Amino acid sequence: TPGPDTIVFTSDWEPQTSQAIVDRLVDLVSSGSLQPDSYSLGGTVEALEERVASDLGKEAAIWMPTGTLANHLALRRHCGIKSRVVLQEQSHIYHDEGDTLARLSGLNVIPLATDRPYFIADELQVALDQSVDGRVLNPVGVVSIESPVRRQAGQVVPWDEMQAISHLCAEQAIPVHLDGARLYMMSVATGIGIRDYADLFDSVYVSMYKYFGAPFGAVLAGSSEFM
């Protein structure tokens, strides 16, 4: 059985009891290795943000309590006044976040690849064209990709397809966000580095609790201006 310091990249990790979480936190505080932070400035939190940003090859990162919040704020920040978000129909954002993009930020989602793990660049191009060629101009503000896709048994968006989508969006000045909650697991499975994946995206979210064993938390990374 893996211990509390073990990192497992083959699953989402075993659920922890409240007592186990408290005991672990007490041990960490007692060790004297945690540096205090004030309003998220300095200390252990900032060190974590800097480490994740460095590992992903991004300029900056910010810790957040949940991945749902990280995804939401990233998409909202990218969109600005362009209120459309293209994503996978099987994504966590579409199915499991309570329509918060529409409820809280007035963003409208365009789900592609119904009952499939991913869409391809040609499908995306059709959606982008429809957003600008219709009777009312309503351009896409951001494209979001989840990989691995939990609802599709953890299937991974192929590297070539990720590259094609990233290049297509770059040509049209549309930012791309990676819901990389399981990015490290994907990297282990494919042999492609986490930085190589992150390079294709303007922003990346990674989970801190799934395989790292943290009680909760997420980190969102991107450019300094984006943050």
Segments (PLM) and residue ranges:
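Conserved PLP-enzyme active-site core in the AAT-like
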Residues: 2-227
